[in-house]
């Protein structure tokens, strides 16, 4: 019976496909014919317009050529009308074919969609009838209990894991306290006690007390009570894990708690920038190079022009070398301008003065010349810090 229906469906599909192809071919032929007729109609209209224009420009005298042309124009007009009617008819047929093609394709799609659904139903029905007792269906939800017995049948469902919770209940207050929680494998645990809760995912059994018997029977639990019990069991498990993790880590925590030692030493002080430059001292000697000297009038302007801002002011610059250090200390130093000192003239004996001048006159000229020498000996602005 099933084979006959399958063959019938297959034949219907093949027939629908053949009709669809035939209809598509017919539509393509109609479209091609419609395009040809439109092209021919356009040609006839342009020909008639040209002949009418030629007749209007010809003389009024009748001739055989004019009569033949008029006759041809009448025939063209008849053909034009026929082509117009044919074009309209083809358009209507083409539209009807396209509509019927869309309807047929829709029915074919619905039939193709319905056929697999029927086959699936037929396949599912025998599988359900042929499934033997004692087997687990994979599409069913897996219970969290070790083995779940289904009422009225011998079908059993394998559990993924089991949790054994030790509970202490206060008879006065009715408060439940979780003492311990242990996760067990399903194969290492068997069903004991009385079932107090069951849903699609889990089953709860009340196990006997220490004396081996349930005291005062077992009361069924609600879903909220079961959730609260599992939540407390999770808290106990986490607390045990935290306590076991803190024991080996006590030494490391004590090491981390050791305070850092302070190392006493010198404190670095930031050096202040000053326009005067660094002050020389024994701890901070200054190396300088002689670059020459120049007499200045306006110190600030000269610094800007020559780029001497930030130089060191020196009241007195002494230039000496190894040879000068070996000389006796009593010898006078060279002046700041770098010229050697002139040897002191020997004092004139007696009252003899060259040029017939008096001694008092020479002393007066020497005193007048001293201010000129002081004006030339300005402070040196010629040293820079390396």
Swiss-Prot record:
This is Paralemmin-1. It is a lipid-anchor. One of its GO terms (cellular component) is plasma membrane. Expressed in the lens (at protein level). Highly expressed in forebrain and cerebellum with lower expression in adrenal gland and heart. Expression weak or undetectable in other tissues. InterPro entries: Paralemmin. Interacts with dopamine receptor DRD3. A lipid is attached at residue 383 (S-farnesyl cysteine). The keyword Isomerase does not apply. Belongs to the paralemmin family. GO terms for molecular function: D3 dopamine receptor binding. A lipid is attached at residues 380, 382 (S-palmitoyl cysteine). Residues 21-40, 51-149, 240-290, 321-378 are annotated as: Disordered. It is found in: Cell membrane; Cell projection, Filopodium membrane; Cell projection, Axon; Cell projection, Dendrite. Keywords: Cell membrane, Cell projection, Cell shape, Coiled coil, Lipoprotein, Membrane, Methylation, Palmitate, Phosphoprotein, Prenylation, Synapse. Residues 384-386 form a propeptide. It comes from the Eukaryota. Residues 97-116 have a biased composition (Low complexity). GO terms for biological process: adenylate cyclase-inhibiting G protein-coupled receptor signaling pathway; cellular response to electrical stimulus; cytoskeleton organization; negative regulation of adenylate cyclase activity; positive regulation of dendritic spine development; positive regulation of filopodium assembly; protein localization; protein localization to plasma membrane. Its main location: membrane. Phosphorylated. Residues 4-115 form a coiled coil. The keyword Phosphoprotein applies. Involved in plasma membrane dynamics and cell process formation. Isoform 1 and isoform 2 are necessary for axonal and dendritic filopodia induction, for dendritic spine maturation and synapse formation in a palmitoylation-dependent manner. The modification Cysteine methyl ester is found at residue 383. Residues 24-40, 68-95, 259-282, 322-334, 365-377 have a biased composition (Basic and acidic residues).
